[in-house]
Structures are given as C-alpha cells and as structure tokens.
Amino acid sequence: MFEGPLQDVIDEFSRLPGIGPKSAQRIALHLLNEEPEDIERFQSALGRLQRGVTFCRICHNISQEDVCRICADSNRDKSIICVVEESKDIQVIERTAEYRGRYHVLGGALDPLNGIGPKELNVTPLVQRIGGALPDVALGAKGGGASLGDADTPADGESSGADAAETGNAKTAAVETDVEYDEAPEITEVIIATDPNTEGEATASYLGRLLRDFPGLTVTRLASGIPMGGDLEFVDELTLSRAFAGRTAL
C-alpha cells in the first residue's frame, strides 16, 4: 500500500463503479506521470462536470439546461413516453433511430433488499406527466414500499396498490411535485424499457399495474430479443430495434 496523496487518489478511484483496487492503482500511477497541464485539464473537467451538468426538470435525463434537448425538440412525438432506468439507456435507444418520442428516467429500479422502493425512484413525476393521481398506497413506505412480490400476484387476502385503485378501495391523492410544466401533452402510450433482469422486470410489472387503468393510455413493454439478465446498455442496435418493433401490451 502506498502512503499519502497517492494512496488517497487510489482510494477515491476505487470508489467508482467497475474500478477495483488494481485498476485504481494503475490510473493513479498514470496520472502521477502526466504533465502538470494535463492534470490541471483533468481537474478542470471534473469541476465543470459538477457545475455545468444537471437533470432535466421534465424527464430527469442528464442535461446542461433546465430542459434537455430531447424534451425541447418540437419534432419529437410528445404523446409517447419511454421509461428507462438510467440516462445511459437513452443513449443506447437513440442510436437505433427507431424511437422518436420522449423519455422518462426513473433513476434506478425496484430493489427492496437495498432499500430502493417506488419513493426512491422518479415514479411520482411520471404519473404527473401522464396527468393522473396516485393511489395513496401505491408508493408505500420509504425503502420498502414495493417489493419484488408487488410485481407478481398478491398473496391471499392482500392486494397491490394498483389492485386497490382498480376496485375503488384505495383513496387517491394528487401528485405533489415542485416541477412546473410548460405544457401538458396528452400521453397515449408509455413504453417500459427497464433492464430485462429481476429488478427491471419487477419495476416493469409494478408500473404496468400502476398505469394500466389510466383512460386512453396504452402501457407496453419492450418485446423479446433482449437477453434475460442483461443490461440495456450492452444490447446491440439490431436486437433493440427488433425489440421496439415487437413490443407488447402489459
């Protein structure tokens, strides 16, 4: 183990996803041999990243402006929303040139074992965009409001938030948000494009139950062709194009 500033840099790089101690050490040693102006340029870029990048107030995509370029594009189909887990998934879909609607970034997927329930995701702003109201039981308690079981058939004597809304037994509450929208286009379709793994499938099923009773709204899921257990980020364009073409209703 190194000491002092070098070890501090190694420790910081080790905190980044996908970078282990050995990779962090190689990066730190490489930076140690760089010219001072290169180090300053790297530091400047990190500073600009923190100061100059924000999240779109409409879709929560990474943006340099209050509204991202996709939401600001008048040529995009405003009646369709594609729901993804992370901003990186938008980049993958855009490369296919198959989709011309707008997006909504959840900021993750349901993972109750790690304390991620609906309240930790951008579910409420999604419903706000559609123009409806949430059942007061739909979001649940922090960190545990939704379990992977919520996406499946409820146990005897129990009902999900969407089922309760369906039978009229749940109270509804207006969606509270600080976001003000310049326009409220009619949404006719929501495409669920979460990753085809356990958490992504649970999230898709949860959203399908939550949104399926909105009048005039079709909720679809990307079709087969994307391998189970994979990440959307690594799917090739042809496979993703076929998945979009063959999407089915939930």
Swiss-Prot record:
Zinc finger feature spans (C4-type): 56-71
PROSITE patterns per record: RECR (PS01300), TOPRIM (PS50880)
Gene3D superfamilies: 3.30.60.80, 3.40.1360.10, 6.10.250.240, RecR Domain 1
Region feature (Disordered): 148-172
Keyword Endoplasmic reticulum: no
Domain Toprim residue range list: 79-227
Entry keyword set: DNA damage, DNA recombination, DNA repair, Metal-binding, Zinc, Zinc-finger
GO molecular function, one term: DNA binding
GO aspect biological process, one term: DNA repair
Protein family: Belongs to the RecR family.
Family annotation (NCBIfam families): recR
Protein role: May play a role in DNA repair. It seems to be involved in an RecBC-independent recombinational process of DNA repair. It may act with RecF and RecO.
Protein name: Recombination protein RecR
Designated gene of the protein: recR
